[in-house]
Amino acid sequence: MNNNVFHFPVLLDAICKLIEDLPVKSDLIYIDSTLGEGAHAKAILEKYDFLSLVGIERDSQILERAKQFLLIFKDRITYFNDWFDNFFANYPLNVKANFILVDLGISMFHYKDSKKGFSFLEDEPLDMRLCSSSCSISAAEIVNTFSKYDLESLIYNLSNEHYSRRISKAIVEYRKIKKIQTTKELQSIINKVYPFSKVKINPATKTFQALRIYVNDELARLKRSLPLWVENLAKDGILAIITFHSIEDRIVKDFFRSLSCDLYVKISKKPIIPSSDEIKKNKPSRSAKLRAVKKI
């Protein structure tokens, strides 16, 4: 396994500013709901010695990487190998959190080194399960068994892919001849039916996004977690959520809007986005949006 940490901590300066706005800076609890390789956690723990970290990560493989990466801070960290919605539904701590961070992006490790088929840049088995024991269906099973209508609905509803009908038809026609097993196979099917005059990103990008979201139940997990996150904030505590596509950002935006003004206040009216300098250094950050709310 490649032990280099791939993940660049997106919107780190904005996150640090939120932490600096906490009124008390002594013995505070910081929960990283999506620990990943620990890039955000390392930068935050280095800068703020008054924080203790609770790190939540469902993928046991990437959690072990994070533990090694954060070894110097081991006395300040408690780890949980779990989905964040399960953790907060059965909240195990005897104190509320002062700062909760949620980064909904997929780690670079999963794209570059997991061999689970999250990326079409390498030819890998079409799996996409972050946790095979709790995710019942793989991406390969979806593209090989779902009806044309169900594929079209899945791809459109989870990625806003305008050519979902064309793509789903091509998938169904292809699998009549041969089972779809790898990322490159699926990418090739999509590329052949996509109008290249319309291409701004790789034609397969949105379909892969939709499959990943479905396989890992990402949107339902987010919706379940939102009320649990705010419920488990301490007074003056802050919940910060980084989204990477319009569907999940809308869910977060609408939830924050629904909160009582007597109990919570939005940190900013509009989402915080990366600077041009950050995007130059880390191209995947270009679609990131940070929304935050404070419990009063």
From Swiss-Prot:
It is found in: Cytoplasm. S-adenosyl-L-methionine binds at G38, A39, H40, E57, F88, D103, H110. The keyword Disulfide bond does not apply. Transmembrane segments: none annotated. SUPFAM superfamilies: Putative methyltransferase TM0872, insert domain, S-adenosyl-L-methionine-dependent methyltransferases. PANTHER family: 12S RRNA N4-METHYLCYTIDINE METHYLTRANSFERASE, S-ADENOSYL-METHYLTRANSFERASE MRAW. This is Ribosomal RNA small subunit methyltransferase H. It comes from Borreliella afzelii (strain PKo). The gene is rsmH.
